């Protein structure tokens, strides 16, 4: 990847942080990466990648349709990366049964999705 132009997300973006951590774990310094664009819009990033102007890192779900329709090709990173997700609720306020039930459901659903992803 080092020899190819990289289309990065804007600073502070979660995917950018995951990409930075991936490169760091692989022993690739930021100065070794050929940055060709730094954008806040995922749609713009996908358009640049589809036009052949560089490669980008995006979540599987964010590019699913583009891959399915043949505009982009996805190459899984090795080792795999994961986006940590958390359910957020008010800190010191009363939590209704509905909020608690939703939080429990969301956690179960995220776990199910992670299992499916590992099996794929």
Stretches found by the model and what they are:
Residues 5-27, 96, 113-118:
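Secondary-structure junction motif
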Residues 12, 20-24, 28-72:
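Hydrophobic hinge/microswitch elements
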Residues 15-16, 20, 45, 85, ...:
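A general structural signal for well-ordered alpha-helical segments in protein cores
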Residues 53, 73-116:
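A late-sequence structural motif
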């Amino acid at each position: 990847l080092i020899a190819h132009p990289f289309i990065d997300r804007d600073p502070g973006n979660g995917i950018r942080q995951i990409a930075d951590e991936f490169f760091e774990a692989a022993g690739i310094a930021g100065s070794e990466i050929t940055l060709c664009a730094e954008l806040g819009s995922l749609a713009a990033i996908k358009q640049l990648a589809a036009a052949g102007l560089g490669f980008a890192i995006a979540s599987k779900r964010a590019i699913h349709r583009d891959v399915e329709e043949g505009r982009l090709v996805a190459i899984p990173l090795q080792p795999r990366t994961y986006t940590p997700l958390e359910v957020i609720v008010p800190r010191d306020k009363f939590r209704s049964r509905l909020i608690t039930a939703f939080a429990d459901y969301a956690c179960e659903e995220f776990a199910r999705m992670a299992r499916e992803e590992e099996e794929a």
